[in-house]
A protein has these predicted regions:
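Nudix hydrolase/Nudix homology domain
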Residues: 111-150
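Active-site-adjacent beta-strand/loop module that shapes the phosphate/pyrophosphate-binding cleft
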Residues: 81-105, 118
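Conserved Nudix-box catalytic region and its N-terminal flanking loop in Nudix hydrolases
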Residues: 29-67
Length: 150
């Protein structure tokens, strides 16, 4: 048995109320650059696990500060990944567009595994991570948002 991943575009996470929300990750932009983090030697977006009692927005705000020492100025839902586990249970992994700004110098998170951050041209993301069609859709949505909203 395998994991089944289904991507859903959305502009709000309201439809997921009461569901098993596991992750909140942001496609974070500082000015026109994409913020990525090196986590255990692998580059990825900023984010992580939603703690008990946290909203997805609170979790992402906390993760952004812990991993990058940046502040979230704006958060807009992009969509979510529905993950159907081999045992038939389903969890949800949320993705949002974020505008961020540094609070100060980057300091490696002592409690975490992020050792480096980079600001890259968003079009170059595949040089750092490639998540197939779902990853392409996440990035496509995130890159479009500033043209619409900002």
């Amino acid at each position: 048995k395998e994991y089944k991943l289904i991507w859903h575009d959305c502009d709000s996470f309201d439809e997921l109320k009461g569901k098993d929300l596991q992750q909140s990750y942001g496609v974070c932009f500082y000015k026109d650059k994409l913020v990525i983090v090196s986590n255990n030697g692998k580059w990825s977006l900023v984010g992580g696990h939603i703690e008990k009692g946290e909203t997805p927005e609170e979790a992402l705000t906390r993760e952004v500060q812990e991993e990058t020492n940046m502040k979230v100025l704006k958060q807009i839902p992009i969509g979510y990944q529905e993950v159907i586990n081999p045992d038939g249970t389903t969890i949800y992994q949320l993705r949002s567009f974020c505008l961020v700004e540094p609070l100060g110098e980057f300091v490696s998170d002592p409690a975490g595994s992020v050792t480096e951050i980079k600001l890259i041209d968003p079009k170059d993301y595949k040089k750092y991570f490639n998540w197939g069609k779902i990853g392409d859709r996440i990035m496509e949505r995130a890159i479009e948002i500033p043209k619409i909203v900002i």
